[in-house]
Amino acid sequence: MREQRPSIYQKASVWGIPFGLYLTCAGVASVFMDWFPPLAFIFMLLVLGSPLVVYYFQRKHFIEENGFAEHAALWMLGIMLYMLGTVLASFIMFLVIQYGRPEFAYDQANHIIKVYSDIPEMRDSEFVTVLKRAVETHQLPSPIETVFNAFWFVTFGGCITSAITAILARRNIKKRP
């Protein structure tokens, strides 16, 4: 009788938890990097490393399937990892922003206004005027809107990235003597 192997969806649900925690670390670093500048470097490392983490899981699945996993299956695994990981990270990030830094969007906007106002060519630009008006009239996104937009951005980017990492994960398995 054939051994029942877990599907890519089952694997993604298990592997999506550590990946979601990984994405959460990147999100926390992005929210607090203006308070602690070395977090900007950590954030960049985590963002650039996320395709490597997905590649690791895709490659692991490919090897477990003895090299018979198709590109579409590996791509779907990557998509599901990003989807499930981003759901977990989004929930945690909402709590972090809502209760840890509820004025995050306004802090960032005020920082941008200050930086652009210090540049003589940009001081009276339309961008600065519009951003000042948005801050004054409280039109910047709420924490849930910020997290929701980040969810779609990471998920879409992850879908594209997963296609590339799936190609790389399908390289030949080395034969053992």
Residue ranges of predicted features:
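Transmembrane alpha-helical insertion/packing segments
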Residues: 1-62
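Short, charged juxtamembrane terminal tails flanking transmembrane helices
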Residues: 1-5, 169-177
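Alpha-helical transmembrane segments of multipass membrane proteins
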Residues: 18, 22-30, 50, 85-93, ...
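Membrane-helix interface/capping segments
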Residues: 58-74, 98
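Juxtamembrane "helix-exit" motif at the C-terminal end of transmembrane alpha-helices
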Residues: 75-103
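Functional transmembrane-helix hotspots
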Residues: 92-120
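Short membrane-interface loop/juxtamembrane segments of multi-pass integral membrane proteins
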Residues: 116-142
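Individual transmembrane alpha-helix segments
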Residues: 133-159
